[in-house]
Design a protein with these regions (language model features):
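ALDH superfamily catalytic-core signature
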Residues: 30, 143, 222-347, 353-354
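Structural signal for hydrophobic packing residues in well-ordered secondary-structure cores
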Residues: 14-21, 40, 44-51, 63-71, ...
């Protein structure tokens, strides 16, 4: 994507957000303010109460409990408000963030001693941090960012996507109420009643805010880069490929691919977006996928579906995804072309060429293109091409260590998953902590509290070395 393309996307996103006809939200009891100035001022006061590690631990424990307690309600509200995703999967995301986001335990000071004395390097807070959150993972991102940022000693001003403002505000209020009930300060987490693009743009330049955390697509990340000179931690788009070679456990691969590509109707940037499979095992893999609540489309059906899902396809084959179909259920997408599939269908898949718009474009819906290749070398090369330089996430199913090593090195993504669904890289079924903010564009990768601190050094010369 060149600079002109990015500018056009940014303009389209800003126009969409500005023209939102969502009715004004009521101001909630706690954490939601009528004005941005009042919200930031309240967060500044609250942040002063986070000086002690014990208070951060108390607040985080309250967030974990409230996040898990209200996980289902927030999942239902998110689907109801945005029309995207699956309640059960959003519930799983919310619970995972409440349980698996690291707290203060991942922050350790460094101490250096030598002939010239002692040096202490500590993790200092930024103060009030601005967090821009998406419509795709609204409550989960609020829970995750709240824990990570508070663990680092920060309070947070959230700028939620207008299409998910109700669920985002509800999450912020519930977490604030839990913190206060546990004895913590009010308004550690704040937002405004009617967030819009102007809210985000003001935060990009707001005095006294030194750190911006942006979780969203390419357009919002580019907008942040263009409009701020503050420290920016940004999570952007991805088009994760999954490769299956001839040595793979095909039954396991089929199960993992359908699970990952259909999780929350494919609206997570880390979900599998294109399947590349070696020809000798392609037919068997697709047969096994059909046994996992996935339906294979014919080439004719895919041709009918293409103009429904994609507009403005350019010379590279890349199109603009119709927002009306992002994150919708597979059965509803099939019905758009008069195709009746079982309601429990989780995924539609179709064999395409490598140049097909479905393969080139990040669809963010449960429609998976499948591309055959002659061998694993071709598969890896195509995976690198279709990933598009996002360096976000990729996966491979193989029993060949050398093949996995070659792909891991070639693809150069923040997350690389072997023999499992891509969501395992987010701590959903794999080892490691959870996050909803994978910051590939700015290089921090899978974020935690360690991402959101300032390192400060204190040096004592010629003293306190005891050996």
């Amino acid at each position: 994507m060149n600079q002109q393309d990015i500018e056009q996307v940014v303009k389209a996103v800003l126009l969409k957000m500005q023209s939102s006809d969502t009715p004004p939200a009521a101001v909630h009891e706690m954490g939601v303010f009528a004005s941005l100035d009042d919200a930031v001022a309240a967060a500044k006061v609250a942040q002063q109460g986070l000086k002690s590690v014990a208070m951060r631990q108390l607040a985080i424990a309250a967030i974990r409990e409230a996040g898990e307690k209200h996980a289902r309600d927030l999942a239902e509200l998110a689907v109801s408000e945005t029309g995207m995703g699956r309640v059960e999967d959003k519930f799983a995301k919310n619970v995972a963030q409440a349980r698996g986001t690291p707290g203060v335990e991942c922050l350790s000071p460094q101490v250096l001693t030598g002939d010239n004395g002692l040096t202490l390097i500590e993790n200092a807070p930024w103060g009030v941090v601005a967090s821009v959150t998406p419509s795709t993972n609204p409550a989960a991102t609020v829970i995750n960012n709240a824990i990570s940022l508070i663990a680092a000693g920060n309070s947070v001003i959230f700028a939620p996507h207008p299409a998910a403002k109700k669920v985002s505000q509800r999450a912020i209020t519930l977490l604030n109420q839990a913190i206060v009930a546990a004895g913590g300060p009010e308004n550690l987490l704040v937002t405004v009643a009617n967030p819009d693009i102007e809210t985000a743009q003001r935060l990009f330049k707001f005095p006294g805010i030194g750190l911006l955390v942006v979780t969203g697509g390419e357009a919002v990340v580019e907008a942040a880069r263009k409009h701020t000179n503050k420290r920016l931690i940004a999570a952007g788009a991805g088009n994760p490929p999954v490769v299956v070679d001839e040595t793979a456990d095909l039954a396991r691969a089929a199960q993992s691919i359908v699970k990952g590509a259909s999780f929350d109707n494919n609206i997570i940037c880390a979900d599998e977006k294109v399947l590349i499979v070696v020809d000798s095992v392609a037919d068997e893999l697709m047969r096994l996928m059909e046994g996992q609540h996935a339906v294979k489309l014919t080439a004719e059906q895919a041709q009918q579906l293409q103009p429904v899902l994609l507009k403005n396809i350019d010379e590279r084959g890349k199109g603009t995804v119709s927002r009306d179909w992002v994150g919708r259920d597979a059965a509803k997408i099939a019905a758009a072309i008069g195709l009746n599939v079982p309601q429990e269908t989780r995924l539609l898949f179709v064999e395409t060429t490598a140049e097909h718009p479905f393969a080139v474009t990040e669809l963010m819906m449960p429609v998976l293109p499948v591309v055959r290749v002659a061998n694993v070398a071709d598969a890896i090369a195509l995976a690198v091409k279709l990933e598009g330089g996002c360096h976000h996430t990729a996966a491979m199913h193989s029993r060949n260590i050398e093949n996995m090593n070659q792909m891991a090195n070639a693809i150069d993504t923040s997350i690389f998953v072997k023999n499992g669904p891509c969501i395992a890289g987010l701590g959903l079924g794999g080892e490691g902590w959870t996050t909803m903010t994978i910051t590939t564009p700015t290089g921090e990768g899978v974020t935690s509290a360690r991402t959101f601190v300032r390192l400060r050094r204190c040096v004592l010369v010629d003293a306190l070395r005891i050996v």
